[in-house]
Each structure stands twice: as C-alpha cells, then as structure tokens.
C-alpha cells in the first residue's frame, strides 16, 4: 500500500455502512489510524487538523459538493495506491492528490489521473490517457490508449473506451458499454456502441 499523506490524522468522508467506506477503512487502516466522518458532519466541521479522502460515490452531487469545499478551502488530502497495482514510470504516470486506486490496476506510462478519482479494481488506464478530476470507475473498466475523459465522469462495471476517444465532463457510462467514438454531450450512455439515453 502506497499512501501519500502528511502527519495529521486521516478522516474518510463517507457513510460507515457503505461498502466503499469499508473498503477505504480496510486498506488505509493497514498502515494508518483512520476515522469516518459523515458528510453532514464534515459540512459543519472542515478542520485543518485532519487530512481527508472522499468515499461518497452513490450521491454524486453530494460528492461534488464535498470535493468543492475541500479544494476551495485547500484542505489536505491523501492519495492511496494499492501495492498490487502497476503504475507506469517512464514517462511516469501522474496521479493527483485525493485519488484512491484499488487492487490489481494497471496505470500505464504517460497516463494522468486527476484529483479525487476512485479507480476500481482490475482497471486499465491506457498509455497517455487522461482522466479529469472526480472520475469514478467501477471494477474491470478499460480506458484505452490516448483517450481523454473530462471531469465528474462515472464508468460502470466492465465498460470500455477505445483508443483516442474524447469524453466531455459529466458523463455516466453504464455497465458493459463500449465507447467507440467521441462523446460531446453530457448525460448517460449505454450500449455496445455507446448511445445517449438520458440527460443525467
């Protein structure tokens, strides 16, 4: 487990009953003491005595609100990379603060992952691909080489993005969807050749 952090205590912002929160506790707790703070309590107390990571992923509006507060107040965040994941080094992959990378991922050389992302297990982020801030990928997602993904995007289980595809902000790709061409409008996409099915 690789954790980039300072010496302050760690708070996971999330719900104790959430499986995502429990995954964060299990991994970070192997080497650090952690406590969970509910989102409503964080909104009342953004103490600079702590460093944070955001485990809220179901209510995406709530997640974005929390992240905006963290960034606007310049609160310290931690970055977690599971030691079973491979991260390219020449040229290096760049992983921004606040991101959590689950086990058995391959983060290829020259790739870039923005702030506050959650990269699910068994993901492949291809060579020179770029993910914006606050992207969440579920298990077994593939983002192929030289693709660009905007901010606040969600990729559900076993969805794929083919080479050199560009995706705008605020896109949800449903499970088993294959994105083969650029996505130029935000919304929800599904199908073997991704098509837009709703606004959000």
Model-identified regions with their sequence ranges:
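Glycine-rich hexapeptide-repeat left-handed beta-helix
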Residues: 138-200
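Domain-scale signature associated with acetyltransferase and cell-envelope carbohydrate enzymes
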Residues: 1-133, 141, 151, 169, ...
């Amino acid at each position: 487990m690789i954790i980039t952090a300072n010496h302050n205590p760690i708070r996971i912002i999330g719900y104790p009953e959430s499986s995502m929160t429990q995954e964060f506790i299990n991994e970070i707790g192997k080497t650090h003491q952690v406590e969970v703070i509910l989102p409503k309590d964080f909104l009342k107390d953004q103490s600079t005595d702590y460093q944070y990571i955001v485990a809220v992923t179901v209510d995406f509006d709530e997640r974005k609100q929390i992240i905006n507060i963290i960034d606007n107040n310049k609160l310290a965040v931690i970055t977690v990379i599971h030691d079973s994941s491979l991260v390219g080094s020449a040229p290096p992959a760049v992983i921004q603060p606040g991101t959590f990378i689950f086990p058995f991922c391959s983060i290829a050389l020259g790739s870039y992952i923005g702030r506050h992302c959650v990269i699910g297990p068994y993901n492949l982020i291809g060579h020179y691909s770029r993910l914006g801030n606050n992207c969440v990928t579920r298990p077994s997602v593939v983002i192929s080489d030289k693709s660009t993904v905007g901010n606040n995007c969600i990729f559900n289980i076993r969805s794929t993005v083919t080479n050199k595809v560009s995706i705008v902000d605020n896109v949800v790709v449903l499970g088993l969807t294959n994105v083969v061409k650029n996505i130029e409008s935000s919304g929800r996409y599904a199908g073997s050749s991704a098509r837009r099915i709703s606004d959000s």
